[in-house]
Amino acid sequence: METSTNPVLVMMVGLSASGKSTIANNLAKENNYIIFSSDELREELYGDVNDQTHNHELFIELHKRIKTALKEGNNVIYDACNLSSKRRVAFLQELKHINCRKECIIAATPYEQCLRNNASRDRHVPDYVIERMYKSFDTPYFYEGFDHISIEYWKGSCNGSLLPMSWAIDYKNYNQDNPHHELTLGVHCINAFFWLYNNKLYDNASIGTIMHAALIHDCGKPFCKTFKNNKVETTDIAHYYGHEHVGAYDSLFFTYGFGISSLFVSALISNHMKPWVWERDNNEKMYNKYKKLWGDYFMECVMILHVADKAAH
């Protein structure tokens, strides 16, 4: 952690049973931070750490305590899942009149490991809760208001064996079972990669990172594939609800070439479906909202990936 003359907020981000609290406790011991935990506050206020019926009131109180501690000059760790970009942005906006450094730590633990960790706990949540979190993970990025973002990997989870091109080749025969996706999953992703490589249309410093994102932008699809629509009706075609979130999370565990940021790749994948939505709905308001949030450069990068995604169908 970098030193700062101002108080520091560290926001933990991660699935349940990913080891967030262990990271937070170790950091607090080493650096004299005060931990504010959503789980501990649930137990304090409602007598049940699993109580989810008072979340609105709980987070109002939690945020109040964090802001008070920061105003008093204390370094603070915000220990909760914090998976929603919208909610992270809203909270960081609450701090705009408090002069503090804002940091984020992503507890990057593979989904299957989270399930194993959860099963071995005395106090555990249902597996479907962790699955729901997995399918709603928004990658934290600097446009949200953070000064620094780091990734803490579960031991052995980032061992250099998972390469983007290898993944795409492994899925060259994976049928997407959807008329909007006539190509197999792997071929589509490889086509997006080579479309960017062959066209060289963009004078963009991050084009190498975008190409890596193109190779695995749909890597969350196999996990999310379902033959039920959003009304839970059985259909003849496959749907992939939440695949961008699963893909963004899983992309953190790939190994990239020199100079490629896994965080940037993940952020691109996390947001790659948004242009499809605002183009489909002709929603200029949505486009302007994200352009204001992201800034020109990140918007440009997302749109480059989007153009490649469309061209590769």
Language-model segments: residues:
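Short hydrophobic/aromatic beta-strand immediately N-terminal to the Walker A/P-loop
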Residues: 9-11
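Conserved substrate/cofactor phosphate-moiety recognition/catalytic segment
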Residues: 22-74
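Conserved GTP-binding G-domain of TRAFAC-class P-loop NTPases and closely related GTPase folds
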Residues: 13, 18, 26, 112-164
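Divalent metal-dependent catalytic cores for phosphoryl transfer on phosphate-bearing substrates
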Residues: 197, 201-312
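Conserved phosphate-donor/acceptor-positioning beta-strand/loop module used by diverse small-molecule
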Residues: 98-114
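Acidic, metal-coordinating catalytic cores used for nucleic-acid/nucleotide bond scission
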Residues: 79-91
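Phosphate-binding P-loop
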Residues: 1-6, 69
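Acidic/His-rich, divalent-metal-binding segments that scaffold phosphate/diphosphate chemistry
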Residues: 153-235
